[in-house]
Regions:
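Short, T/G/N/S-enriched strand-turn elements that build extracellular solenoid repeat scaffolds
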Residues: 35-38, 55-60, 81-84, 105-109, ...
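Exposed beta-strand and adjacent loop surfaces of beta-rich binding modules
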Residues: 46, 65-67, 80, 115, ...
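A mature extracytoplasmic/lumenal domain signature
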Residues: 51-53, 60-64, 70-74, 98-100, ...
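Short acidic/polar N-terminal linker immediately downstream of export determinants
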Residues: 5-9, 18-65, 73-76, 99-109, ...
Length: 203
C-alpha cells in the first residue's frame, strides 16, 4: 500500500517545476512489501535515517531514488514493516519501523553522494559505498563503516562506551571502556561514529 501526501500549494509548484520550492515538503509511505521504492529526492543534501533495531545495511547507489529491500528467513512476516520518507528541497528523512527483529535484513539503497545521518537502537549495522559526511550512532551491537577512501576525511571521531574501536582505515585500534579515536587531516569530509556497547569497525 502506498500513500503520498502533498499539500495543495506543493502540488501546484511541482506541476509547474521539476524541482522543489523553498519550504516544500513531500511525504510518502510504503509498507508490507519486500521491495519498497520512492520517487527521487534531491541527489545532493542531507539524508537522516531512523531505523528500528535489527540487521541493517545502508548502501550507496548511483540512483537518485531511495529503495528498501527486505530479505531473510522472516521476509514473509513483513506486513507491519513501514517506511515513511519526507523530502524537501535539499534534504530527506526516512523512518523505518515494524516487522520481526530477528532473521530479517533491511537493505536501504541511498544516493551515494548524500551526507548521511543515521540512528539505530541496536543490531548489526553496515554502511558502504557512500561518499560525503557521515554521522552514525548505534546504541548496542556491531557497526561497520566502509569509508571508501580514508584520504577524503578531514576529521574523524570514533568511540565506544564499552567494546572495541577498530579503525583500520586510519591505522588505529582500541578496546576497553570509553575508547575513542580522533584524527585530523586535509580531506573535505567529516566522520562521526559511535557505539554505546559493542564493536565499531571503520575500514
Amino acid at each position: 500500500m502506498k500513500s503520498i501526501l502533498i499539500t495543495v500549494a506543493a502540488a501546484l509548484v511541482v506541476a509547474a517545476s521539476p524541482g522543489y520550492a523553498a519550504g516544500t515538503k513531500i511525504q510518502s509511505t510504503e509498507s508490507g512489501k519486500p521491495h519498497m521504492e520512492f520517487a527521487p529526492c534531491p541527489a545532493k543534501g542531507r539524508l537522516r535515517l531512523f531505523v528500528r533495531s535489527g540487521e541493517i545495511r545502508i548502501v550507496g547507489s548511483d540512483e537518485a531514488r531511495l529503495s528498501i529491500d527486505l530479505s531473510g528467513r522472516k521476509s514473509g512476516q513483513i506486513q507491519d514493516v513501514k517506511a515513511r520518507l519526507t523530502c524537501s528541497e535539499n534534504s530527506a528523512e526516512l523512518h523505518v519501523t515494524g516487522g520481526p527483529h530477528n532473521d530479517l535484513t533491511i537493505t536501504i539503497h541511498v544516493p551515494k553522494n548524500l551526507d548521511l545521518y543515521a540512528r539505530v537502537p541496536a543490531g548489526e549495522v553496515s554502511v558502504e559505498g557512500i561518499t560525503g559526511n557521515k554521522d552514525v550512532e548505534l546504541h548496542a551491537g556491531e557497526l561497520t563503516i566502509d569509508v571508501v577512501n580514508a584520504k577524503d576525511y578531514g576529521h574523524v571521531d570514533a568511540s565506544v562506551y564499552a567494546g572495541e574501536v577498530d579503525a583500520e582505515a586510519f591505522g588505529d585500534n582500541k578496546g576497553g571502556l570509553f575508547r575513542s579515536i580522533s584524527k585530523t587531516a586535509g580531506g573535505p569530509y567529516h566522520l562521526h561514529a559511535h557505539v554505546g556497547s559493542g564493536q565499531l569497525t571503520i575500514r
